[in-house]
UniProtKB/Swiss-Prot annotation:
Organism per entry: Christiangramia forsetii (strain DSM 17595 / CGMCC 1.15422 / KT0803) (Gramella forsetii)
Main function: Converts heme B (protoheme IX) to heme O by substitution of the vinyl group on carbon 2 of heme B porphyrin ring with a hydroxyethyl farnesyl side group.
Domain of life: Bacteria
GO cellular component: plasma membrane
Protein name per Swiss-Prot or TrEMBL: Protoheme IX farnesyltransferase
Transmembrane annotation, as ranges: 20-40, 43-63, 94-114, 116-136, 142-162, 173-193, 215-235, 241-261, 276-296
Alphabetized Pfam families for the sequence: UbiA
Organism taxonomic ancestry: Bacteria, Pseudomonadati, Bacteroidota, Flavobacteriia, Flavobacteriales
Amino acid sequence: MSNTRVHNPSASILSDFKEITKMRLAISVVFSSVAGYFLGADTIDFVTVTLLAIGGYLMVGASNAYNQIIERNLDALMDRTKNRPLPAGRMSVPVAFTIASAFTVLGLVVLYVINPKTAMFGAISIFLYVSIYTPLKTKTPLSVFVGAFPGAIPFMLGWVAASGSFSIEPGTLFMIQFFWQFPHFWAIGWWLFDDYKKGGFFMLPTGKRDRGTAIQIILYTCWTILVSLIPVFGVTGKLMLTPVSGIIIFLLGLGMLYYAIRLFKEKTAEAAKKLMFASVSYITLLQIVYVLDKFIREWI
């Protein structure tokens, strides 16, 4: 029996489409937006939820496609990214640009159907990510600070979609995800430091895998935990958190802090990788706890 594998062009095209839009990342961003919507909605409108998910996915996919167009030559230098559709030559720039442009237009239209402010914040996010954050990545470690702004929008975007306005509640959600960006992306920058160096990317605050970077990771992890607990004290409007849920969030934060301290002690790529996964677990579980806390308070 022959072991020859038949090449499936359709499967290859679909795979490249998923990669140029970073489907898995887009889905995680949609999760944040939907969580924010559940927190801000007085009654759940599943049509709005669907529009938010579709619009959010399209905007994130567009940002990722534009990013890969801009960085295609640098991606070719790094082991992690050299097999992406553009540097590998499986997709042309015009095709990628067409995908990005179509996603942008469709995404903005879908978000505008929800309400104008949701579309406005979606547009701000894609502009900051593509036009400012992406070019800065090869110029200064401050790119992480700039990138934290569009990166923090999805969680608050859901609340804006539910309420049609920006106030202290979505502002708090924004701050939680804003501070979280720093330990998360610095952990990635430490873990993949050698590969990023090949592409000329500046990801760590000191530019090195050193004590200074590790200390800043610990500090921003602490800030993330503290900001996450503010709703417990009843000072963030309709966004509230019961003491029990606050304790759960605090314990989750201690778990993330544990891995940040381990990175400080070990200063290894493996420790950074573990912190990266811990940070993803933290923000995901935090959003779940926030949503469950709201629903339980309403049911009791």
